[in-house]
């Protein structure tokens, strides 16, 4: 989370986890926190650094360099524990907002009719790639930690995310048209 004093925030896209996290933060803080959707994180981070956007909610790999260079201040991370990439930045939970704990994740998806053997082979290849030397370091530059896992793990994660975010999306009144 990047923040100035104005009550607006950017996110990399409408309907993204950062969009909903910012909206939830505004609701929990009792402020009218206006969303400014961007097409990706880079333009929003540039606007925070340039002073034309008050704050940005985005994956931390998108702003670590600006934080370390002192061009912006990161006030919180949303993980369960402090990020190994930003150990000086407290979590929302540490600051009294445990409901803002979110572990953002990325997955690989294929069309619904992709044969099961192709999905299984892709899953094996991805898990093997994540174990290769240098992959963790490369992902770390982006602020990511490789996890890997089974197809069942991914299905459980998707359901858990749906169960978590569904009520929040309804609470803030977001629709695909909004």
Regions found by a protein language model. Name each.
Residues 1-178:
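Conserved, function-defining micro-sites of small-solute handling proteins
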């Amino acid at each position: 989370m990047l923040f100035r004093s104005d009550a607006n925030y950017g996110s990399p896209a409408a309907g993204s986890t950062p969009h909903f996290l910012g909206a939830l933060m505004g609701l929990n803080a009792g402020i009218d926190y206006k969303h400014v959707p961007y097409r990706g994180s880079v333009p929003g981070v540039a606007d925070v650094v340039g002073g034309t956007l008050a704050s940005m909610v985005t994956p931390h790999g998108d702003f670590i360099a600006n934080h370390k260079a002192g061009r912006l201040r990161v006030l919180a991370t949303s993980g369960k524990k402090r990020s190994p990439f930003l150990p000086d930045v407290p979590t929302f939970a540490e600051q009294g907002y445990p409901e803002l704990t979110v572990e953002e994740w990325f997955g690989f998806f294929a069309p619904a009719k992709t044969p099961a053997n192709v999905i299984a082979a892709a899953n094996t290849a991805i898990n093997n790639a994540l174990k290769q030397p240098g992959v963790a370091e490369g992902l770390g530059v982006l602020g990511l930690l490789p996890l890997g896992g089974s197809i069942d793990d991914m299905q459980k994660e998707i359901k858990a995310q749906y169960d978590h975010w569904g009520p929040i999306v309804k609470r803030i009144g977001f629709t695909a048209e909004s």
